[in-house]
Structure formats: structure tokens, C-alpha cells
Amino acid sequence: MKVVAPMAGICDSEFLLRLVPYGFDVLTLGGYNVDEATILAGEEIIKRGRKEFNYPLDTVFSQIELEANNIKSACDALVSCNLRCVNPDSVVRVSMIESVDIVEINCHCRQEELLSLGCGQNMMLRPDLEDYISYVVDNSNSKVSVKIRANVEGVDTLSIAGLVDDCGADYLHVDAMKPNAGADLDLINDISNCTDIFLIGNNNIKSIDDCYNMLDAGADGFSIARACANGILNFDLNEL
């Protein structure tokens, strides 16, 4: 699985379709803010100059459907949608969009406005995380991914990985960030050894060799963000 990772304010259908020729087979829309609280947070993030996909609550779901339909009409890639919301109902609602293959719960974002809501990487600190993921898994009409950030202070990454696996999610998407050390491939190996879930490794993939290193560490697939953030990839994933 070769995934374009979510990039807020960047990964819409027009951008993602430019990357298909490089060999990606999963295209991630978003992240999208999909409830009132996260939409208000998105407005504050935009005010300080960051890019966001931020639509009113009465239009965001139709916008996601439009973007997903655009991709499906142009290629055979799977469409994933990375979502931020305080409660899981909006994730389930997006899963009902026929052209969305995967809904991805965002436990990754670091923006303070979202962290203050218990969203983004602070999802991993919530006592109801298991209930949240299980609700999505039990009610979703699509496959379910959970994207986490590794090595967050106060969070046991291996415990979170096990929780996601136990909840029955289809994919665990791990930003194997390790401050000042590149991708934490040892952690990817540890997660692979202690879970059965399909593991997507992310962080610092800038070449074909980096892809192989991530796979050799135990990931079942990988995702790329920054290396393709300008809509161009300087290596060809079709070689894998």
C-alpha cells in the first residue's frame, strides 16, 4: 500500500490526482474538520496563517463527497479521508459516502486549537478513545484507519497501537516521528511484532531506499507527505 498522507489545506482531489502517475494507490483527502467544535478551531488556525480545509457544517460532507467523486471518476486508487471531530458520529457519516473507501481518525494533528478539544494527538490521552474507535468500527460503511503520532510525551505508543488493533480497525497509520532522529524504525518494528493490524509507516520517506527501509522494519505499507507536498515526487513508486 503506497499512500499519499493527509496534509491540511493541500490534499484535495486536484492535488492528489497529480500524484497518481508516481505509483500511489491510496489517496488521502484532508484532514477535514467535521463538527462544530473543530470547524471553529479551524477558523482560528486559519487566522494565524495556516492552511486548512474548513467548510461550514452544512456543506462539509457534500464537499468531501465531491472531492472523493472527482478521484473515483479519474482513477482506480482507494480514497481515504482523514477526519477531525470531537465525537465519532461525523466519522461514521463520512463513511456512508459511497466513493470513500477508508475513513481515518486523526490522532495526529498538533495544532493547539484542536488539542484543546481533545482532538489530534490528544485523542491518545482521552479515556474514551477505545469507545470512540470501536463505535466507528462497528458502524462504519467503509474501512477504518487510525493515524497516530509516535513518541508523544505521556503516551505509550505500543499501548495505543494495541488498543487500535483490539478495536478492530483495518489500518494503523503511524507517523514514526522521533525528535532529531528521523523515522523511528525500531518502533515500527516493535509495533509490527506486537500487533496483527495492517501497519502503514510514515515519516521522513524521501527515496525508494527509505520506502524499503520502512517495509523492512515491519510496515505493511507506507505513506509520504512532505516529499510530495509540491505535487511532484522525485522518485517513482512504480519501481517497488
Where does each model-flagged region fall?
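N-terminal capping/small domains of soluble enzymes
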Residues: 1-79, 83-87
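Hydrophobic faces of well-ordered beta-strands that scaffold small-molecule active sites
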Residues: 2-6, 25-30, 79-83, 103-105, ...
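Catalytic cores of alpha/beta
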Residues: 12-21, 87-99, 151-166, 194-197, ...
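Glycine-rich phosphate-binding active-site loops on the catalytic face of alpha/beta enzymes
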Residues: 27-37, 101-114, 169-181, 217-237
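Active-site-adjacent beta->alpha loops and helix N-cap segments on the catalytic face
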Residues: 38-43, 61-68, 88-90, 109-141, ...
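Short acidic, glycine/proline-enriched helix-loop-strand junctions
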Residues: 45-55, 142, 194-201, 239-240
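Helix C-cap/helix->beta junction micro-motif
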Residues: 75, 139-140, 167-168, 195
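Well-ordered, non-transmembrane segments within structured domains
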Residues: 77-116, 128, 159-165
